[in-house]
From Swiss-Prot:
One of its GO terms (biological process) is positive regulation of secondary growth. Pfam families: LRR_1 (PF00560), LRR_8 (PF13855), LRRNT_2 (PF08263), Pkinase (PF00069). Residues 1-27 form the signal peptide. It is an enzyme of class 2 (transferase). This is Probable leucine-rich repeat receptor-like protein kinase At5g05160. Its EC number is 2.7.11.-. It is a single-pass membrane protein.
Length: 640
C-alpha cells in the first residue's frame, strides 16, 4: 500500500512538473508577445505591421524571429528597419524581451531618450538604432548594466549629446562602434575598448587627444571634431604655460657669464657657417640649372621645352589616329576637338583629384576655361613603342560611350601624361561616400550605373582585353549620371598589379596570390562594386594591430549576413526609402555573390552579367510602370 501510494505521489509530482514547465515556457513566449503588442500600441506605425494575437508570433509577425530550436522558443530578433515607426519607445516594452539578440530599428522617426532597459538586455549582441532622432545624454547612471554581449552598437545619425559614457568600457566583446553625426562632447579617453575593430566618432563636438589604442583608426573616423587632435589627425599643440616661481629657470640664466659669452660666440660661428654653406649650395644649384637649360635647348627631352609647335596646327588637321611622333610631343586623338599644347597644360591652374593605382590625377583649367584631367603616370615599364601602341588601342576602345574619352597623351623619358575629358559629376565612389550627409543615390541611378559599367566591361572583354583595375573610383559620371570607365587597359604598361589600400578590397583572391589579372578577376571586381552599391559600404582597408592593414572583405561580410538570414541588414539604409524594389535588390545581390565566387571558373562571364542586369532593370521599369498605371487608375476612379 505504501509503495503504491509512493508511486502515485511520484507520478503526480512528475506530471505537475511537466505542466509547470509547459506553463513557464508558454508564459515566456506569451510575455514576449505582450511586450511587442504593448510596443506596437504605444508607437504609431503603418498598417503593414501585422502584429495581432490572431497570427502566429514566430511564423507570421513581420520582423520577428524566434529561436525555435530552443524548447522555450523565445523572440531573439526584432528587425523593423525603415517601416515608418514614429514616436518614443516606452520602457517595459522592448526592454522585456530578455532573450533578444538582434534589435534593428534604424531609419525610422523615433525620438526621445534611449530606454536603459533596452541597452541592458542581457543577451543583446547587435543593436542598430541609426538614422532616427534619439536625444538626451547617455550617462553612466542611465547605463547601469549595459549588455556586455554587444558586438555591434550603431547609434549614428541621431541627436545624442553629452559625454561618451565611461560605462562603454565594459563592452568587452564589441567590435563595431558607430557614434558619428551626433552631438557628443568632451574627451574620448573613456573609450578603452581593446576588442573594437571599427570605430567612427566623426561629426560630433569631441575634444582632446585621441587615445593611443585608437590612433590606428582612419582619419575619417574623427573628422568633424575641430577640437580633437593627435594621430591620425593633426598633432596636438602644447598649451601655453603660465609663469611660475616653481618652474625651473632657463638654462642660460644658470650659466657662468664667461660661458654665456662663449655660447654666444658659438652661436654666431654656427650662423655664419650655415650662411656660407647655403650660399655655396645656391651657386652650385645655379650652375647645374644653367647647364640643364643649355642641354634642353640643344635637343634634350625636357617636359617644358620641347613642344613641337602644336599650336601651329589644329588637332583635327592631323588625320586619323595618333599624330606623327616626330612632329609633336603632345599627341591628340582623332575625336579631340580641343586646341592646346603641353605648355598650356603646364601653365594651367591645377587641382589634385586623387592618387590612383597608376598615378596622380589633376584637374587642369586652361586659359579658355576648358577643363581636362591630366593623369601623371608613375613606374611605367613599357618602352616608348609599346606605350604608343597601347595608346592607339586605348584610343579606339574609348570611342565606346561608356569609357572616359582619352584626348591626348605625352611621352618622354621622364614624364608620361594622359589627358582625359573632365567628367563633371566625379566618380561613383564620390557620390556614394564623399558626403555622407547628402548621399541621395536612388535605386534607379544605381541600376543605371551598373548597367552602363557592365556594358563597358563586356565590350572590353569582347575585344579580348582585360581592365585590371575596376573599382568605384574608376567609374566616372557624366552630367546625366551616365557611367564611364577610366584607366582602361593601362595595366599592361606597368609592373604586376600592386595591392594598395584602395585596390586590394576589389582584387580577386587569385590576383592577390598570383598577381595576375584576367577577365574572370574583372568580373570579381565588378561584383564587389555591385555589393558596394547595394550595401553603401566601402571595401577599403582599415588600420589593424601591429601596423598591419586589415581589409574589410565586403564579399565575406555580405555572405556572413546572408547566411544568418539577415538579408535586410545587408542593404544600404538609403535604399530602404524606396518602395517595391525588394525583389530587384535581392536579384542584384544574388548576381553580385555569383560574381565574387572564390573559384574563378564559377563566376559568370561579363556578357552574361550585363544581360542579367538588363533583365533586372527591365523588370524594375515594368513594375514601376504598372505601379504608376495603378495609381493613375485609382486617381481616375476617385475623381469619377
Amino acid at each position: 500500500m505504501n509503495s503504491s501510494h509512493t508511486a502515485f505521489v511520484a507520478a503526480s509530482f512528475f506530471f505537475l512538473l511537466l505542466a509547470a514547465t509547459a506553463v513557464l515556457v508558454s508564459a515566456d513566449l506569451a510575455s514576449d508577445e505582450q511586450a511587442l503588442l504593448n510596443f506596437a500600441a504605444s508607437v504609431p506605425h503603418p498598417p503593414k505591421l501585422n502584429w495581432n494575437k490572431n497570427l502566429s508570433l514566430c511564423s507570421s509577425w513581420i520582423g520577428i524571429t524566434c529561436d525555435e530550436s530552443n524548447p522555450t522558443s523565445r523572440v531573439v530578433a526584432v528587425r523593423l528597419p525603415g517601416v515608418g515607426l514614429y514616436g518614443s519607445i516606452p520602457p517595459a516594452t522592448l526592454g522585456k524581451l530578455d532573450a533578444l539578440k538582434v534589435l534593428s530599428l534604424r531609419s525610422n522617426s523615433l525620438f526621445g531618450t534611449l530606454p536603459s532597459d533596452i541597452l541592458s538586455l542581457p543577451s543583446l549582441e547587435y543593436l542598430y538604432l541609426q538614422h532616427n532622432n534619439f536625444s538626451g545624454e547617455l550617462t553612466t547612471n542611465s547605463l547601469p548594466s549595459i549588455s556586455k554581449q554587444l558586438v555591434v552598437l550603431d547609434l549614428s545619425y541621431n541627436s545624442l549629446s553629452g559625454n561618451i559614457p565611461s560605462g562603454l568600457r565594459n563592452l568587452s566583446q564589441i567590435t563595431v562602434l558607430y557614434l558619428q553625426n551626433n552631438s557628443f562632447d568632451g574627451p574620448i579617453d573613456s573609450l578603452d575598448l581593446p576588442s573594437v575593430k571599427v570605430v567612427n566618432l566623426s561629426y560630433n563636438n569631441l575634444s582632446g587627444p585621441i587615445p593611443e589604442h585608437l590612433k590606428k583608426s582612419p582619419e575619417y573616423s574623427f573628422i568633424g571634431n575641430s577640437l580633437l587632435c593627435g594621430p591620425p589627425l593633426n598633432a596636438c599643440s602644447g598649451g601655453a604655460i603660465s609663469p611660475s616661481s616653481n618652474l625651473p629657470r632657463p638654462l642660460t640664466e644658470n650659466l657662468h657669464p664667461v660661458r654665456r659669452r662663449q655660447s654666444k660666440a658659438y652661436i654666431i660661428a654656427i650662423v655664419v657657417g650655415c650662411s656660407v654653406a647655403v650660399l655655396f649650395l645656391g651657386i652650385v644649384f645655379l650652375v647645374c640649372l644653367v647647364k640643364k637649360t643649355k642641354k634642353e635647348e640643344g635637343g634634350g627631352e625636357g617636359v617644358r621645352t620641347q613642344m613641337g609647335g602644336v599650336n601651329s596646327k589644329k588637332p583635327q588637321d592631323f588625320g586619323s589616329g595618333v599624330q606623327d611622333p616626330e612632329k609633336n610631343k603632345l599627341f591628340f586623338f582623332e575625336r579631340c576637338n580641343h586646341n592646346f599644347d603641353l605648355e598650356d597644360l603646364l601653365k594651367a591652374s591645377a587641382e589634385v583629384l586623387g592618387k590612383g593605382s597608376f598615378g596622380t590625377a589633376y584637374k587642369a583649367v586652361l586659359e579658355d576655361t576648358t577643363a581636362v584631367v591630366v593623369k601623371r603616370l608613375r613606374e611605367v615599364v613599357a618602352s616608348k613603342k609599346e606605350f604608343e601602341q597601347q595608346m592607339e588601342i586605348v584610343g579606339k576602345i574609348n570611342q565606346h560611350s561608356n569609357f572616359v574619352p582619352l584626348l591626348a597623351y605625352y611621352y618622354s623619358k621622364d614624364e608620361k601624361l594622359l589627358v582625359y575629358k573632365y567628367m563633371t559629376k566625379g566618380s561613383l565612389f564620390g557620390i556614394m561616400h564623399g558626403n555622407r550627409g547628402d548621399r541621395g543615390v536612388d535605386w534607379e541611378t544605381r541600376m543605371k550605373i551598373a548597367t552602363g559599367t557592365s556594358k563597358a566591361i563586356s565590350y572590353l572583354h569582347s575585344l579580348k582585353f582585360v581592365h585590371g583595375d575596376i573599382k568605384s573610383s574608376n567609374i566616372l559620371l557624366t552630367e546625366d549620371l551616365e557611367p564611364c570607365l577610366s584607366d582602361t587597359s593601362l595595366v599592361t604598361l606597368f609592373n604586376l598589379p600592386t595591392h594598395t589600400p584602395r585596390t586590394i578590397g576589389y582584387n580577386a583572391p587569385e590576383v592577390i596570390e598570383t598577381r595576375r589579372v584576367s577577365q574572370r578577376s574583372d568580373v570579381y571586381s565588378f561584383g564587389v562594386v555591385i555589393l558596394e552599391m547595394l550595401t553603401g559600404k566601402t571595401p577599403l582597408t582599415q588600420p589593424g594591430l601591429e601596423d598591419e592593414r586589415v581589409v574589410i572583405d565586403l564579399p565575406r561580410w555580405v555572405r556572413s549576413v546572408v547566411r544568418e538570414e539577415w538579408t535586410a541588414e545587408v542593404f544600404d539604409v538609403e535604399l530602404l526609402k524606396f518602395q517595391n524594389i525588394e525583389e530587384e535588390m535581392v536579384q542584384m545581390l544574388q548576381l553580385a555573390l555569383a560574381c565574387v565566387a572564390r573559384n574563378p571558373e564559377s563566376r559568370p562571364k561579363m556578357e552574361e552579367v550585363a544581360r542579367m542586369i538588363e533583365d533586372v532593370r527591365r523588370l524594375d521599369q515594368s513594375q514601376q510602370l504598372q505601379q504608376n498605371r495603378t495609381s493613375s487608375e485609382a486617381t481616375s476612379n476617385v475623381s469619377e
